[in-house]
Amino acid sequence: MDAHDGEADELPPPPPVPANVVPIKADDVESEVPANKPAKPKRFPMARPGLGRKGQPIQLLANHYKVSVKSSEEYFFHYNVILKYEDDRPVDGKGVGRKVIDKLQQTYRSELSSKDFAYDGEKSLFTIGALPQVTNEFTVVLEDVSTGKTAANGSPGGNDSPGGSDRKRVRRPYQTKTFKVELCFAAKIPMNAIAQAIKGQESENSQEALRVLDIILRQHSAKQGCLLVRQSFFHNNPNNFVDLGGGVMGCRGFHSSFRGTQSGLSLNIDVSTTMIVKPGPVIDFLLANQKVDHPDRIDWQKAKRALKNLRIRTTPVNSEFKIIGLSDRNCNEQMFSLRQRNGNNGDVDEVEVTVYDYFVKNKGIELRYSGNLPCINVGKPKRPTYFPIELCSLIPLQRYTKALSTLQRSSLVEKSRQKPQERMSVLNDALRHSNYDSDPMLRASGISIAQNFTQVEGRVLQPPKLKAGNGEDIFPRNGRWNFNNKKLIQTCSVDKWAVVNFSARCDVRNLIRDLIRNASAKGIQMAEPFDVFEESPSLRRAPVSRRVDDMFEQIKSKLPGAPKFLLCLLPERKNCEVYGPWKRKCLAEFGIVTQCLAPQRVNDQYLLNLLLKINAKLGGINSLLQIEASPSIPLVSKTPTIILGMDVSHGQPGQSDRPSIAAVVSSRQWPLISKYRASVHTQSPKLEMMSSLFKPRGTEDDGLIRESLIDFYTSSGKRKPDHVIVFRDGVSESQFTQVINIELDQIIEACKFLDEKWSPKFTVIVAQKNHHTKFFQSGSPDNVPPGTVVDKQVCHPRNYDFYMCAHAGMIGTTRPTHYHVLHDEIGFSPDDLQELVHSLSYVYQRSTTAISVVAPICYAHLAAAQVGTFLKFEDMSDASSSQGGHTSVGSVPVPELPRLHEKVRSSMFFC
């Protein structure tokens, strides 16, 4: 699912950084390579050392369509596009660019040697072969361009048809609009670079050539009137819409992109979903968005934020505008100056009228309910243009870029499910309906697309055997296991604990009784709680900080000492407002392990899942890999090895100023690989590269890695790790060189800071979940079995990558995780590395199922999300200006997170 912010028609993502280029900021050039220090040799993603062989062979289909490319000595010519109005003002609207270029192509076809264009909608245009001139200047006239401009301030109907009395106040829409277009030669790209990319000989040219092909796909969809979101396109077809409530709809479309693979060039097509605003009357959207049943109950400040920058169509004149805000007063009170010609002497007088009177009396338009509501402003900040709200309707295919509610997310998942066979049918239909073979630019590029899925050879790895309590074995089946009649392998004792109840609905006594009974069955010694602390009903509407503080005052006044553990019953769902302040109080201020729950239907399975989390948080282990308990993991069990999981969590859509949160989890108590701890820092908003792995401050290092290394040393018999395995989540292919240069260098510096002579070996692996490759069993309606690994046919032609489906896809179509091995000094064989990755999907202590990505990455995501709630309730402006904040280059200060209490710093508090 596409969940990124962005304009409807924007540039494709930049191509991956070529092998001979490492991106750096211009400002950092001097500081990066000091005069007295030679530049470090740069690392590049490693080549594939071989293929895996372990596992049961399985024949699969992938949603890649093979592409044949005719050999060509031609070139793609790249031209920069400069668009201006007739008066030399730059054209800033994105939608008009394609219309202008299409008209240019029609008008000047002979002057352009009948060349076809590939235009990205912005500033880049490509042709096959050169245009007649290096610089080409044209004048283009578009008809029926409605500008929405007005002649003077305050007019309520810039595109209306005024009567004789106000004809000078409002111009009719321009019937034609003149543009100046300049096409300037920028570069040429050999088309045979595509063939080089397929052979694994990547260069800047090959990436640019593939980018041109992707731009052709986008242009092809744009000509069909689609909404474009990166490489995905969405048709205005109500059959593709699902109502999620709140005035939001899920819109199903398709992703399409060209990819170089081991078997040649392929077209990857997949189902994609984006969120759109429900089209129709503005008032209907606002009522649904705010969940109210009458316009009088609308919060107009919220409405203003929700409507800003959306586009509307007005009646009765059918003109389109962008909303910039709302009027300060209601429609029947909002005044503006109207110039009218005096019938007696022909002079022009100015009169003050309300927007309501203008439309009702001057225009003869009946307004049923707009009088007491604000107007829609479609003008400019200093030149407002107002329309009554009931004359405005939201146009289709406008992206909704704010965060979805929990209910909306659940609804989207429920309504977007597709079984594998259904998805295959939908994708094949999408390719046929796209009719790419008719595209003149693709034909001229020598591109021909097959109509069938690519056949792929996969392998199914055996699930790892697990160890439970009393030496019993667990044999997972279909990615699942259970603890029926078994105990946990290493249990904690819960003796100093209490229950905190913010909920008025829960039967606390029965919950405690059943929890203790289930704990005993799994080998956990759980005493009766010291007390149950009930929130006073009078505080339930109080500020959340007061509610949490009051609860801790109760605890301190009644308990003889600090509890080891607090069970917290939340008033509603888990992400309620109490959650963040409660976690912060427990983990940062008092060092108390806490487990929150919002029980609705409590049964023994629910309580077992709860106990798995409690046991892990308090230092226990629920199950171990048999090869971990032996220990016999190749290259891990015999040499001290630390495993790191790294992730950066960003603010949700609409929270662009919220700091990003970087988390590093690290294994402890080697030779175990099932126990972890976490370190978390804030960094600049939307910054994906980690900036806090190594942070020297005088004689100290305040970075994330130092804490992990010291904890490994103290928990592993005073051994320093000789091997460091890094799993990195959330980065794109264009950022791979930064991971193995900028981030890996920080980790190495952190090691050297502790011991100059210490030189561990590193393996760096990136895990990607947001890709569009899916696998299907030919002739079977089922998902691919858990343990399926693919490293042939559809993987990179040179680089070391593979796809892993470790989990059982119970609903919809399984999404494999795409692992990229960027760097491997340790020297794993392909089989050993794939087995390790597979095994790490079985050490997730929160559940009894294999998970879709290695546990260290899941833990890093959980840690970042949980500690991120510490900031959710702070005044960000105050936090940003406090002395505790740190400042990144060219940005505002970033608030620092409170440090975790030493009692819980090495715990699995995030579990």
UniProtKB/Swiss-Prot annotation:
Family from the record: Belongs to the argonaute family. Ago subfamily.
GO cellular component: cytoplasm; nucleus
GO MF terms held by the record: RNA binding; RNA endonuclease activity
Positions of region (Disordered): 1-51, 149-171
Full protein name: Protein argonaute 4B
Keywords: RNA-mediated gene silencing
Residues annotated as domain Piwi: 565-872
